[in-house]
């Protein structure tokens, strides 16, 4: 096709885009609400690409013709076994990815792609090998440098317990800490709402706190005292000033039996002082080398616990690598989209249709079902289960419980010598028995609406 003189490339208008995709029409035999959703997704994939291109106006009809041709070629034949095609496509990838791992030197770098990630996704592992959450700052903090950001999140992310902050701990009698009498009384007067006489308590837990860890997490002993009082207000707490040579923290225990003392101490040691449950570390990262915007990648944690940091992080951009964390927080529909995106990232060369089919198989029951040897044995057909593995045990169980074979699956139909309901065998022919009994049924040869061409093909006569 020749271009007109002085014709320039330009963006497509809305009317032109609608003209190009108008060949995609709804099917009359599908419920309208379902079919409209399918048509919308089909058109959206093409429209999203059309809005970005520039083209000569005279080539628009040619573009439409080519898109329609490619669209028709991409349609699967009715009755095709799409499951085995998708399994072959993904099996080829996993085989090649496994071979590629033998050519990578060094140790695991924490990558969220490759064979291990693929296994985590299809097995729906509750304990993934790489459990990360990516946190993005709100616009107010985006332009801050990394030093300011470190100060901002110093005591807010990593889960810190009392046992993490101490160097040593020992149970002593209260009379043995008399040399700290003045400092303890000053602390009680300054940091306690109600005055108490610490000498009324027989035993005391003396803890030496790590100055380095207190500075790292930006904690003051008074913060520790307030947190412990929330958990156990029956014990009393005091500490030496941070300017002391040793930062000592005292817990005055109101019981005098060894078992009770040990239980109280163990409970207090496991109490969280600051941070988010489950987060054991975090790292600052950038999207690329030349990007000034920082984000945080944590190890551990969950979506539900991150919500307490909504004043710092933009929770709409938060990402996780845990399937079950996402499912428990946002539900099955969000999990479906997550699985599609993750599998597309891992298997970049596999068609998206195969991935969507796999995800539908994993989530159609309303929860997440892994694709493993155990879930594949949940078929209602005894022959289909027996064709997978443990044939003898499967037949014994089927006979014991009087299971019925419906012969609806492909494997069972092949074993039983029955025509499988795939391809052209998906359709059944219905006969009008009344007309048959009356002899009114016409053959195709007798029907005036059909005729044969010279090459023998049957055609419809309008």
Curated annotation (Swiss-Prot):
This is Probable DNA-directed RNA polymerase subunit 343L. Transmembrane segments: none annotated. The keyword Nucleotidyltransferase applies. One of its GO terms (cellular component) is DNA-directed RNA polymerase complex. Its EC number is 2.7.7.6. One of its GO terms (biological process) is DNA-templated transcription. Keywords: DNA-directed RNA polymerase, Nucleotidyltransferase, Transcription, Transferase. It comes from Invertebrate iridescent virus 6 (IIV-6). It comes from the Viruses. Component of the DNA-dependent RNA polymerase that catalyzes the transcription in the cytoplasm of viral DNA into RNA using the four ribonucleoside triphosphates as substrates.
């Amino acid at each position: 096709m020749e271009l007109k003189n002085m014709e320039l490339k330009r963006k497509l208008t809305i009317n032109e885009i609608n003209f190009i995709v108008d060949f995609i029409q709804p099917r009359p035999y599908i419920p309208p609400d379902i079919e409209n959703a399918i048509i919308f997704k089909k058109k959206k994939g093409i429209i999203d690409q059309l809005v970005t291109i520039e083209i000569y106006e005279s080539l628009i009809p040619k573009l439409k013709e080519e898109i329609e041709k490619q669209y028709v070629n991409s349609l699967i034949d009715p009755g095709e076994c799409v499951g085995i095609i998708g399994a072959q496509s993904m099996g080829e990838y996993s085989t090649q990815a496994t071979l590629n791992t033998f050519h990578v030197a060094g140790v695991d770098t924490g990558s969220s792609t490759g064979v291990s990630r693929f296994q985590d996704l299809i097995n729906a592992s509750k304990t993934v090998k790489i459990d990360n959450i990516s946190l993005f700052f709100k616009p107010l903090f985006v332009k801050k440098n990394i030093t300011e950001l470190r100060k901002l999140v110093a005591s807010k992310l990593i889960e810190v317990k009392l046992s993490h902050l101490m160097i040593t701990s020992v149970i002593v009698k209260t009379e043995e800490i008399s040399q700290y009498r003045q400092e303890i009384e000053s602390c009680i007067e300054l940091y306690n709402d109600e005055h108490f006489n610490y000498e009324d308590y027989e035993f005391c837990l003396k803890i030496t706190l790590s100055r380095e860890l207190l500075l790292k997490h930006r904690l003051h002993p008074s913060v520790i005292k307030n947190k412990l009082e929330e958990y156990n207000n029956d014990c009393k707490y005091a500490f030496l000033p941070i300017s002391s040579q040793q930062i000592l923290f005292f817990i005055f225990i109101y019981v005098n039996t060894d078992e009770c003392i040990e239980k109280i101490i163990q409970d207090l040691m496991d109490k969280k002082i600051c941070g988010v449950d489950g987060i054991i570390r975090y790292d600052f990262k950038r999207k690329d080398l030349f990007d000034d915007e920082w984000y945080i990648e944590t190890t551990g944690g969950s979506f539900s616990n991150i919500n307490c940091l909504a004043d710092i992080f933009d929770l709409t951009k938060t990402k996780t690598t845990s399937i079950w964390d996402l499912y428990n927080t946002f539900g099955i529909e969000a999990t479906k989209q997550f699985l599609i995106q993750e599998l597309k990232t891992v298997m970049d060369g596999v068609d998206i249709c195969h991935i969507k089919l796999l995800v539908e198989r994993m989530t159609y029951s309303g929860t997440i079902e892994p694709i493993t040897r155990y879930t594949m044995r949940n078929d209602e057909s005894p022959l289909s289960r027996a064709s997978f593995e443990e044939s003898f045990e499967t037949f014994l169980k089927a006979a014991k419980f009087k299971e019925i074979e419906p012969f609806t699956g492909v494997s069972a139909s092949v074993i039983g010598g029955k025509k499988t309901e795939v391809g052209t065998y998906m359709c059944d022919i219905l006969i009008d028995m009344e007309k048959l009994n009356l002899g009114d049924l016409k053959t195709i040869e007798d029907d005036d609406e059909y005729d044969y061409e010279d090459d023998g093909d049957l055609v419809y006569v309008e």
